[in-house]
């Protein structure tokens, strides 16, 4: 994705200027299946905030607004996003890979709304991942897994091998929402960080156990949120080498 808006955030950090962060998404961002846990420090955006406060400290700290809404997707947020984010955020984090409502057009409309905000905040799409669970009786994909699921996700090699990018030329029901989001980010030149992209190889090889960083098939544990925060921090503070990507679509952008 384009780096021009993130470059403005880096410039503000280097000047010791306070940065305002907004995060929108579903239960992963909210921190709960039923309520927003705005003080939950294990969430990826809180960990990003803590890292920025440590690396680029400012008086009173940088600010964060948790606009996550449990159990909702972009079908809701595209209509109400202005009620769930700071008035003038410098950086917006958008997390919907596991609950896009099978309606990527809603995500696209939300993305366009954010790209056209007059103050042109930097956007980063945060793709968590729904990990596959294979039913032992017939090898078909199960709806989800959790701590009571009858197969040991940490030790069962069949479960590790079932994790994939999806079949070429065939829409994968587990990955289709996530793939649609990635396609939209490429089209609009919006930066994206991906749990699947970072961890799939280690999971398939057995070097990393899914339950070591996930609470169930969709919701990260604290370690999973740490991985997402690390991906965000790297993308924010380490611009791509020799990037030639055109600016993200939206208003012409100059750092304020």
State where each predicted segment sits.
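Serine-esterase "nucleophile elbow" of acetyl-processing enzymes
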Residues: 1-67, 79-93
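Extracellular serine-dependent O-acyl
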Residues: 1-5, 124-126, 171-211, 227-240
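Histidine-centered active-site loop/cap adjacent to the catalytic His
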Residues: 22, 208-255
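Cell-envelope and extracellular/periplasmic
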Residues: 27-28, 32-36, 63-82, 87-105, ...
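Catalytic cores of nucleotide-enabled group-transfer and carboxylate-activating enzymes in metabolic
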Residues: 44, 48-51, 98, 113-114, ...
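Generic structural signal for well-ordered alpha-helices
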Residues: 107-114, 178
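Helix C-cap/helix->beta junction micro-motif
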Residues: 117-119, 188
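Substrate-gating cap/lid alpha-helix
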Residues: 135-196
């Amino acid at each position: 994705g384009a780096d021009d808006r993130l470059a403005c955030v880096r410039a503000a950090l280097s000047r010791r200027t306070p940065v305002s962060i907004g995060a929108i998404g579903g239960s992963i961002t909210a921190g709960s299946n039923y309520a927003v846990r705005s003080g939950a420090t294990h969430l990826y955006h809180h960990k990003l905030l803590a890292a920025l406060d440590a690396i680029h400290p400012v008086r009173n700290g940088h600010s964060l607004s948790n606009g996550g809404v449990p159990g909702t997707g972009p079908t809701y947020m595209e209509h109400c996003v202005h009620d769930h984010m700071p008035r003038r955020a410098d950086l917006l984090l958008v997390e919907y890979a596991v609950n896009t409502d099978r309606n990527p057009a809603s995500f696209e409309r939300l993305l366009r709304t954010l790209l056209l905000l007059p103050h042109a905040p930097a956007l980063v799409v945060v793709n968590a991942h729904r990990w596959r669970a294979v039913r032992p009786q017939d090898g078909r994909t199960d709806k989800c897994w959790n701590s009571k699921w009858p197969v040991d996700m940490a030790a069962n090699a069949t479960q590790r091998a079932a994790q994939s990018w999806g079949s070429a030329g065939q829409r994968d029901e587990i990955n289709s929402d996530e793939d649609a989001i990635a396609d939209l980010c490429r089209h609009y030149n919006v930066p994206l960080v991906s749990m699947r992209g970072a961890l799939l190889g280690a999971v398939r090889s057995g070097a990393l156990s899914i339950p070591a960083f996930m609470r169930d098939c969709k919701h990260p544990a604290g370690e999973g949120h740490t991985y997402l925060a690390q991906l965000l921090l790297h993308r924010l503070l380490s611009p791509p080498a020799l990037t030639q990507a055109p600016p993200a679509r939206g208003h012409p952008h100059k750092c304020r």
